């Protein structure tokens, strides 16, 4: 079976793609699978949070991980999108971003071996900031490259298969942690180093794609952020709702902190949390997506409420002295990640349905810039409060999430025109 036939079978194509597309498709699946596996092995919400806590880093560094990763991947996108237009072959931005992520991940692994305490926190957070910026470059460039190398009816198969393969790998990693075969934090450092190697390999493989040259353009100006916000009240309210729901992304490290503070911080507990997170994604994403097609605002409202309930449940377990039990963190995290995926699905659906067709890219870039800024501010709030108590920071996030869910009910129902 040649490359074209194999890719046709994988993608379910009715017609066999040409040789170039078949080769590109297989290489994109392999490269994306490696990067998505890396994402799971280095997950800041769980893996890096656990590692920093095990290294004795102050809580402020642990709680800074998600804001650094998420905001760092959002804020530069407008600038990088402008730069992308000046490149004839846009695969190089993705390949370069993947290589830089790999080097940053290896830096995190080295820091985990060499440092402890606040020095480990500082070094790992700095390396994660570099990784986040590189991730932004990959995010901006991938759709451009895929649009030129894979036919429209086969693109979803590429990303879908890569996600499925990565999910299996992360579940296997979680199972190893649960099994007790891996006994110390060195196993987590090795996993982070493996993520770095996979990113390097993915970048090298992606650079071999056969990409048609694009017409080089002058870098366009940045979208008028203030004007865009001023002219559309629906966009302003949507950004406010999405901003109030950022605790769904920020809260997992606090659950890790409370679990380890009240328990023994065993690797098996980390494995259980990774498994719970993977199951939440697998079981809820499709359902949330279908519900968002009916009413994205109701999904945002429900997800905000679910997130608040999950955080309150963790606080109740913590104050009852049960947060360190082997089941508490994973069960609460499952509920929280179900809510997170609801927000993730509904925010995209609502923005696409709300925005005028000709302004969708502009609305998305403005929303991402605003949310990146809000993530940083929320992260600073959480970090400041966590120096006093991670529990009180989580309580604050529960209130904010509930407010976001309530405000979502006031959004216009865009799915019905």
Model-derived features: where do they sit?
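Helix-loop junctions on the cytosolic side of multi-pass membrane transporters
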Residues: 203-219, 409-417
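Helix-to-coil boundary motifs at intracellular loop junctions of multi-pass secondary transporters
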Residues: 54-55, 86-87, 145-149, 258-263, ...
């Amino acid at each position: 079976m040649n490359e074209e036939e194999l890719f046709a079978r994988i993608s379910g194509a009715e017609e066999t793609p040409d040789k170039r597309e078949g080769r590109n498709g297989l290489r994109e699946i392999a490269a994306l699978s490696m990067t998505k596996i890396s994402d799971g092995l280095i997950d800041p919400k769980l893996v890096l949070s656990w590692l920093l806590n095990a290294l004795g880093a102050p809580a402020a560094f642990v709680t800074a991980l998600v804001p650094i990763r998420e905001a760092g991947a959002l804020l530069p996108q407008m600038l990088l999108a402008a730069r992308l237009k000046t490149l004839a072959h846009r695969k190089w931005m993705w390949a370069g971003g993947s290589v830089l992520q790999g080097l940053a991940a290896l830096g995190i692994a080295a820091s985990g071996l060499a440092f402890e305490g606040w020095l480990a926190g500082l070094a790992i957070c700095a390396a994660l900031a570099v990784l986040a910026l590189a991730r932004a470059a990959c995010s901006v460039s991938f759709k451009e490259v895929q649009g030129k190398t894979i036919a429209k009816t086969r693109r979803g198969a590429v990303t879908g298969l890569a996600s499925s393969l990565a999910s299996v790998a992360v579940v296997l990693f979680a199972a190893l942690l649960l099994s007790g075969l891996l006994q110390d934090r060195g196993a987590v450092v090795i996993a982070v180093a493996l993520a770095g190697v996979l990113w390097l390999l993915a970048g090298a493989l992606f650079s071999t794609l056969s990409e048609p040259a694009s017409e080089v353009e002058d870098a366009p100006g940045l979208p008028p952020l203030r004007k865009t916000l001023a002219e559309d009240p629906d966009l302003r309210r949507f950004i406010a709702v999405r901003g109030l729901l950022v605790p769904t992304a920020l809260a997992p490290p606090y659950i890790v902190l409370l679990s380890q503070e009240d328990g023994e911080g065993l690797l098996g507990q980390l494995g259980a949390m990774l498994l719970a997170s993977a199951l939440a994604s697998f079981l809820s994403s499709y359902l949330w997506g279908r519900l968002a097609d009916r009413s994205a605002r109701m999904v945002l409202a429900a997800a905000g409420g679910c997130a608040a309930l999950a955080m309150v449940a963790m606080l109740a377990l913590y104050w009852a002295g049960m947060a360190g039990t082997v089941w508490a963190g994973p069960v609460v995290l499952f509920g929280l990640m179900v809510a997170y995926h609801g927000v993730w699905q509904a925010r995209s659906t609502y923005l696409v349905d709300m925005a005028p067709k000709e302004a969708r890219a502009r609305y998305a870039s403005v929303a991402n810039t605003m949310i990146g800024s809000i993530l940083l501010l929320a992260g600073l709030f959480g970090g400041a409060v966590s120096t006093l108590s991670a529990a009180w920071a989580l309580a604050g996030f529960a209130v904010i999430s509930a407010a976001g869910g309530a405000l979502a009910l006031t959004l216009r129902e865009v799915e019905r025109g």
